[in-house]
């Protein structure tokens, strides 16, 4: 899949899809996934780094 910008609820939905039953860390106030995936495009591999 191509890299894409994912913000807010779109980012959460993508994490649910990628992580499934493993769940994930989502702390919007913490630097990390938002910078990586919202401010700049990220890949599904990047998202997997945030799964539990």
Swiss-Prot record:
It is found in: Secreted. One of its GO terms (cellular component) is extracellular space. Keywords: Carbohydrate metabolism, Disulfide bond, Glucose metabolism, Hormone, Secreted. It comes from the Eukaryota. Disulfide bonds join 7-38, 19-51, 37-42. SMART domains: IlGF. One of its GO terms (molecular function) is hormone activity. One of its GO terms (biological process) is glucose metabolic process. InterPro entries: Insulin, Insulin-like, Insulin-like_sf, Insulin_CS, Insulin_family. Insulin decreases blood glucose concentration. It increases cell permeability to monosaccharides, amino acids and fatty acids. It accelerates glycolysis, the pentose phosphate cycle, and glycogen synthesis in liver. Belongs to the insulin family. Heterodimer of a B chain and an A chain linked by two disulfide bonds. This is Insulin. The gene is ins.
């Amino acid at each position: 899949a191509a890299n894409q910008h994912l913000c807010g609820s779109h980012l959460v939905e993508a994490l649910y899809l990628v992580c499934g039953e493993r769940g994930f860390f989502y702390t919007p106030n913490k630097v990390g996934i938002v910078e990586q995936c919202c401010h700049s495009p990220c890949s599904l591999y990047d998202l997997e780094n945030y799964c539990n």
